[in-house]
From Swiss-Prot:
Subcellular location: Cytoplasm
The reaction(s) this protein catalyses: L-rhamnopyranose = L-rhamnulose
NCBIfam families: PRK01076.1
InterPro entries associated with the record: L-rhamnose_isomerase (IPR050337), Rhamnose_isomerase (IPR009308), Xyl_isomerase-like_sf (IPR036237)
Family under the similarity heading: Belongs to the rhamnose isomerase family.
Species of the source: Bacteroides thetaiotaomicron (strain ATCC 29148 / DSM 2079 / JCM 5827 / CCUG 10774 / NCTC 10582 / VPI-5482 / E50)
Record protein name field: L-rhamnose isomerase
Length: 418
């Protein structure tokens, strides 16, 4: 029996199994078609970027490993991203950091960046049906230090304020050109290695910096703000903590970013979704896999990621959440890393959408705890993978592990020769 026939037969069985618990698999497939990931450009080159005078990676983040074949320039990075996207079902976005501008070999300091430096990206995105998102970049620069937007040195603080203002202008042009808002994330590494006696001072400075940055209103971009529990070399204090950004986001009606690696390992990011959605307009996700710290391992279909996507579906918040990925593993094939992590996130969403939520809520409303728990457990064994396989088949991408050989071929013909 041909593989396509097996996929079709398995799907037909899944349709009946899910119908028995009140789930419409065709509706799930249609919803999945509108589920767009924002692929992070920095997996392709280990967060190096294209600045002429690029600094070493800093800001408490690390890309570990030295697998051969990383992208060395803008053309290679674009080619690798397109290759990865060809194995990911559906249409997706691309998330750029400011250091990935098309600087044409010129020295452009961070406070001098202009929309023109991303003109070729905008054109590329249109050509390949890939809308763009954006990030300001506070790390890997001579003025990064331990503090950027919260720096008491007014000259340095204003440098980063100007940088971030200009990044918002770039994001506005991206959104205008693509006819869809560009989501611009703001994360700064600011913090202290050892005990500080000025917590309030630095947070007041960050608050003032953000107010200056967000003073200009734009129609074609949306801001989101991201916290972190700590970074390497900044273990004792992080200015932009979770509490800080929740307060700022709620008081300023700003989108909050939840990076799954930016919390204590015992915290549930999924549990934060329902609370935040009561107070902020939208959420941005940076889906990663923290191993003991914010290690940015490749996303997999693990319990925390599954719980996160289930909670979004249960909250009825599909339209209020934006789905970005944020990991960078330099120890394995980078195109493979993109595909594994992206498809893992999509698998989690597929399973979340297939949950028999109506029946589960009926049990809960009736106080039928045994029945609710029993169905939650039995649902795990339902053939969600047959629905996922059909989604891949409908989108003309490899089903199952077939992409492995394709990526090996690209490595042999392209990346291994770099």
């Amino acid at each position: 029996m041909k593989k396509e026939e097996m996929i079709q037969k398995a799907y037909e069985i899944a349709v009946e199994r899910y119908a028995a618990v009140g789930v419409d698999t065709e509706k799930v497939l249609k919803t999945m078609q509108d589920f767009h990931l924002s692929l992070h450009c920095w997996q392709a080159d280990d967060v190096t970027g294209f600045e002429v005078q690029a600094g070493a990676l800093s800001g408490g983040i690390q890309a570990t490993g030295n697998y051969p074949g990383k992208a060395r320039n803008i053309d290679e990075l674009r080619a690798d991203i397109l290759k990865a996207a060809s194995y990911i079902p559906g249409t997706h976005r691309l998330n750029l950091h400011e250091i990935y501008g098309d600087f044409q070999g010129k020295v452009v300091d961070r406070d001098q960046v202009e929309p023109e430096h991303f003109k070729s990206w905008i054109e590329w995105g249109k050509e390949h049906n890939m809308k763009l998102d954006f990030n300001s970049t506070s790390f890997s620069h001579p003025k990064s230090g331990d503090l950027s937007l919260s720096n008491p040195d007014e000259g340095i603080r204003q440098f980063w304020i100007e940088h971030t203002k200009r990044c918002r202008a770039v994001a506005e042009e991206m959104g205008k050109a693509q006819g869809d808002p560009c989501i611009m994330n703001l994360w700064v590494h600011d913090g202290s290695k050892d005990i500080t006696v000025n917590r309030m001072k630095y947070r007041a400075l960050l608050k003032d910096s953000l107010d200056q940055i967000f003073a200009t209103e734009y129609k074609n971009m949306k801001d989101c703000i991201e916290s972190k529990v700590f970074g390497i070399g900044l273990e004792s204090y992080t200015v932009g903590s979770n509490d800080f950004y929740i307060g700022y986001g709620a008081s300023r009606n700003k989108m909050v970013t939840l990076d799954t690696g930016h919390f204590h390992p015992t915290e549930s990011v999924a549990d934060k979704v329902s609370s935040l959605l009561l107070y902020v307009p939208e959420l941005m996700l940076h889906v990663s896999r923290p191993v003991r710290w914010d290690s940015d391992h490749v996303t997999i279909m693990d319990d925390p990621t599954m719980e996160l996507f289930s909670e979004i579906v249960r909250c009825g918040a599909l339209e209020r959440v934006h789905y970005g990925l944020d990991y960078f593993d330099a120890s394995i094939n980078r195109i493979g890393a993109y595909v594994i992590g992206s498809r893992a996130a999509q698998k989690c969403m597929t399973r979340a959408l297939l949950e028999p939520i109506a029946k589960l809520r009926e049990y809960e409303a009736n106080g039928q705890g045994f029945q609710r728990l029993a169905l939650l457990e039995e649902e795990k064994a339902l053939p969600w993978n047959a629905v996922w396989d059909m989604f891949c088949l409908k989108n003309n991408v490899p089903v199952g592990e077939d992409f492995i050989a394709e990526i090996e071929k690209y490595e042999a013909e392209v990346t291994s020769k770099r």
